[in-house]
């Protein structure tokens, strides 16, 4: 999500990988600390997302990758491939 977006911007601006990683490390650590208690509650649980708003794919990616949830089904009313292909690729790992 955010890291991928920031990495794309950093690459476009010619920022090397090491300075980029150093710059985002405090924010990543803070985010991980904030998510720890939720991971304990959500890891291994199943999620079924009904189609509603086109946010299902990014939400599913977050729940699976960051919170350890198992995705049973992810429905979406519409998929704009130009916007969602990278998110969809992150659902399968």
Language-model segments: what does each one mean?
Residues 1-93:
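An N-terminal assembly and electron-transfer interface module characteristic of large anaerobic redox
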């Amino acid at each position: 999500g955010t890291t991928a977006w920031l990495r794309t911007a950093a690459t476009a601006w010619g920022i090397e990988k090491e300075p980029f990683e150093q710059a985002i490390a405090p924010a990543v650590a803070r985010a991980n600390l904030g998510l720890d208690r939720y991971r304990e509650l959500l890891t291994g649980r199943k999620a079924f997302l009904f189609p509603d708003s086109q946010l299902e794919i990014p939400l599913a990616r977050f729940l699976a990758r960051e919170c350890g949830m198992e995705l049973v089904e992810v429905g979406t009313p519409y998929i704009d491939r130009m916007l969602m292909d990278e998110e969809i690729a992150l659902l399968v790992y």
